[in-house]
Amino acid sequence: MAIEEKQSRFRISDIARELQVSPREVLQFVKQEGGKVASTSSMVGEEMRDMIFGNFSQEKKLVDETRKIRAEKKKRLTRLEEQSRKAYEKEQQLKESLSSAPSPAPAAHTPEPVKEPFVEIPARHEPAVSPAAPAEQPVIAETPQPESPKEEVVATKAPEAEAKPVEQPEKAAETAVEAQPEAQSQQEPGAEESAEASQTLVQTLPDSMKTYEAPQKIGGLTVLGTIDVSSGSDRKKKSRKKSFKENAAELKDEFEGATSGSSEGGEAGRKKVAKAAGEGESTTGGEDASGKKKKGKKKKKVEVDDKVISKNIKSTISGMDDSGSSGSRQKFRKMRRMERERELEEAEAMREAEKSLIKVTEYASPHELAELMGLTAKDIIQKCFTLGKFVTINQRLDKETIELIAMEFGFDIEFTTEVEATTTEEQVDNPEDMKTRPPVVTIMGHVDHGKTSLLDYIRRSNVVAGESGGITQHIGAYEVTVEGDRQITFLDTPGHEAFTAMRARGAQVTDIVILVVAADDSVMPQTIEAINHSKAAGVPIVVALNKIDKPEANVDKIKTQLSEAGVLVEDWGGEYQCQEISAKKGIGISELMEKVLTEAEVRELKGNYSRDIMASGIIVESELDKGKGVVSTVLVQRGFLKVGDPFVAGNSMGKVRALMDERGKRTDEAGPSTPVRVLGFEDMPQSGDVLTVMESDRDARDLAQKRQIIKREHEFRRSTRVKLDSIARQIKEGLKKELSVIIKADTDGSIQALADGLMKIHNEEVKVQLIHQGVGQITETDVLLAAASDAIIIGFRVRPNVNAKRLAEKEDLDVRFYSVIYHVLEDVEKALEGMLSPELHEESLGSIEIRQVFRVPKVGNVGGAYVLDGKVPRDANVRLLRDGVQIYEGQLDSLKRFKDDVKEVDSGYECGLSLKGYDDIKVGDVVEAYKIVEKKRKL
């Protein structure tokens, strides 16, 4: 417990830092809320912390959004750094490959950089240069300027490239065709001389045309850079210088994103020209061709890496800053990208949350917890040891311990019942199968306010006659046809306080609540409770003010009390419909039904009427019939429940043997909102369980067995824990008295009401221990269990069989029979009061003053005393006071008048006395006489 308290305390300054507000503001708020704090270093509990967060909700929202933005920015910066690192590694690899590459090899790929940039241009001029590769050679000679000596040099150095691949003529032809348009557009009068020079050039290469293709291509490209006579020289020099000396600088500039879109286009154009021109000047004539080939390959690799690096970095920068995007399309793409990233992050966060959320049933073992958390059982046990709990690997842990362990390991716990842990797959409703269904109306209100009388008049039958004391003992479900052949299903709930669970269950399965309030009474606690149940379930309320025919009826008083309870009727400007009725005389009943049907039409109640879907419903009530077995009242919610359907309901299963309405008439099927009595249960289901039709008996049995196993584990753990706790408590505080009880009743709802009522009757010393509960008559097994447990048997509207009655008389057991629940609760309360230890009170009898002390041989000191007040009996308890301080407490050893022993001495008389076991009596001591009186206690 100390650990839990420590973890639930928070410092005010830490809370203020988390909210990013002034600690003094938080301190002032805590003081306004009544918190006992002295400074910003004071600690507050978890409840006060939640109140602080609620008061500073806007600040907390801003802080959470800021943290989220920072987290997203941090993630993007991390991705940018990772991409930059990869780009830097690629650059280093590129430099290493350029420095280690051999000189002859690059020529094989020299034409590729020139091929890619201009591949679209020849498409418009291709018909003019359609001849094959050998015929294209004269065309190449048309492009150069009249610098024929330079072409002679290139031709003479051609033998160095004899080992080149055969496909180079085709590439050279393409390059020549690409260069032709510019050459034709800027052709000068000296072009005829260049044509003659080209003819002489072709004649000097009779046998080595294939090996000459690559140099011829390179030679033509070298001259191609000088086509623009007006301003081509500067561009040529600049492009050559940049491609030769600033390859690394270009890479760095693009890497840093410094170049704009227009400058990138210009640089790209210059790079294309530079590549076409051979990319670099040769320092010596003999190394010109090989140098150009090497530079060409280097530039090819650099260009590919530039594109990848530039694309990655620009996309990252544009994702971080709006200035990086230009145009609506780029902005739209950026927004879509950010949206996808946000969705991915949210999905990842949800997956992480699901990973940290584990669903367990209560009383799981350390081994099961370890499997769910992905840990070892040793880790769980060690954590329990550190928390002060000594457990074994298969020991069942309670709910608090499981929550504490999960919090220590950073997991969220969600507890499920045995039914939720084995839930069947939810079937999807087809909109075409959804049709209007009859409303389910629950009648609620205080006991004796006329709920059953109202239903009695609507059904035009005497329901109350079958109820003991005129009080409804269980939920009744009835289907009624009102005017206009409209169907309404009514649920009649008990009104007295013992049936709180039943009213809550009725509110959960209903569509509309009729709240019956007696006009001659007032709004009672059960009326308020019914209102709260209805509001919690989100069910509309129609108020019925009953007994208006009585002279003492006061409608306005009831409406005032209802408004104070949060139910403001329409007559007073509220939203709740109200109708004044008399259930006995039938006044206002038809108007009440119209309002109920109107409310149902507004809500547009739909039900699945498909015959292909598996039916399901709610167990409203269960009982054990002598000739029929277990009979349950089921309110069908979807589909059609038919005879022969296998089903599972809670921990029980079965097969529908028969269906009957509330009047005992057999039927073959029941649709939505239809109450029906079902025969065929193997075990007694609990009220409120969901009945689900299964595909086969085997599926139903397997599911029911799984639920039964989990339930047995829970019950075993609960009983074991109670015994262990009671042993420790009895050792520490003394024996706690228990009244063991066995309950047998006619219906499951009555058992639940009795159990809830009996559990409320207890205090620190006595309590009711419910040994067993069941539906049906009292049997020999119940009697034997009561004899072994020293328990009493309570039969609620049931009797024992012959053998059980004979055995109970033989064992001298206390078997009691009741038909009204109040009598059970009253008798059990009296029995518990009799088990309570009586209260002890001290009653003063008188006081005696010691005036002289005598020494008597073989007796000791004897005091001569005078009775100041009261009457002192011989057997009274006494205490000796000296100067107001208690010296002795005990009993009188002797009391005498003169020499005679007396039973008592009245006020104003002298006497002699001696104390039992005490001899130090002195003059002036005062002896007080008193007795202990026992007083009966009440719960």
Swiss-Prot record:
Q: Which organism is it from?
A: Chlorobaculum parvum (strain DSM 263 / NCIMB 8327) (Chlorobium vibrioforme subsp. thiosulfatophilum)
Q: Which residues bind GTP?
A: 445-452, 492-496, 546-549
Tell me where it mainly resides.
cytoplasm
Q: Which GO terms describe its molecular function?
A: GTP binding; GTPase activity; translation initiation factor activity
Q: Keyword annotations for this protein? A: Cytoplasm, GTP-binding, Initiation factor, Nucleotide-binding, Protein biosynthesis
Record-linked CDD domains: IF2_eIF5B, IF2_mtIF2_II, mtIF2_IVc
Tell me which HAMAP family the record gives: IF_2_B
Localization of this protein: Cytoplasm
- Where does the tr-type G domain lie? 436-606
Query: What is this protein called in UniProt?
Result: Translation initiation factor IF-2
**Annotated spans, G3:** 492-495
